């Protein structure tokens, strides 16, 4: 399984409240600044590489329609295929936030919404071995799918060789995070797949523990992949 790096921000804009009809000129709309921030990000999308994903929601846009909002809050997350590129997108996000605040005479702050998730440093010997074990235990093995999510296993993979195989628990084409997928986890096929995965991971762990040459090969492959990530 491949994963994307991820960073989450809570972006808060502060302005000046005023009555939207009686004295709108006295206000500085934090909501307008928040909307402009999202507009600026959208203006950058045509130049995004395919791996860059930026998603956001406005969590607070004011309390009443007849009051110019003095506070607005956005929760956003963005993903890329490497930590190096994540930092580049981070700079773009901050520029858009500061530009929007400046244009609307507001202030802005960015706070981490959660800890960063790193992308996956893939290790070819581990992927090859786990594929062989899964096949030996009767599980159909396919190619590694393009990354569509994030996992803290990516963080682990920047510290030591790691792997996170993805198992199919049903023959039906079900979307994740749905009630249909939840129900599929209760069926015998799902339990058989999980047992197959556990047995395969156990076999791989024993190979790592008992085969010094294999351990060395895994570590060398990991170091090579890590250097490539650092040079992106």
Describe the function of each predicted region.
Residues 102, 135, 223-227:
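Generic surface-pattern signal
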Residues 136-141:
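Acyltransferase
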Residues 1-128, 132-134, 145-154:
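Midchain, well-structured core segments that form catalytic/ion-binding scaffolds
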């Amino acid at each position: 399984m491949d994963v994307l790096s991820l960073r989450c921000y809570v972006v808060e804009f502060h302005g000046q409240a005023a009555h939207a009809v009686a004295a709108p000129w006295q206000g500085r709309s934090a909501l307008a600044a928040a909307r402009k921030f999202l507009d600026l990000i959208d203006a950058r999308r045509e130049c995004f590489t395919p791996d860059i994903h930026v998603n956001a929601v406005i969590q607070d846009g004011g309390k009443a329609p007849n009051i110019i909002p003095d506070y607005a809050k956005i929760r956003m997350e963005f993903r890329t295929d490497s930590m190096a590129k994540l930092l580049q997108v981070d700079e773009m996000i901050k520029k858009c936030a500061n530009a929007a605040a400046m244009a609307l005479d507001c202030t802005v702050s960015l706070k981490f919404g959660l800890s960063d998730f790193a992308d996956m440093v893939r290790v070819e010997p581990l992927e090859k071995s786990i594929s062989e074990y899964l096949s030996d235990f009767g599980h159909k093995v396919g190619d590694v799918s393009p990354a569509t999510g994030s996992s803290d296993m990516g963080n682990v993979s920047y510290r030591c060789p790691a792997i996170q195989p993805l198992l199919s628990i049903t023959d039906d084409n079900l979307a994740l995070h749905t009630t249909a997928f939840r129900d599929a986890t209760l069926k015998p096929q799902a339990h058989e797949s999980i047992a197959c995965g556990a047995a395969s991971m156990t076999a791989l762990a024993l190979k790592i523990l008992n085969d010094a040459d294999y351990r060395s090969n895994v570590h060398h492959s990991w170091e090579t992949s890590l250097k490539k990530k650092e040079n992106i």
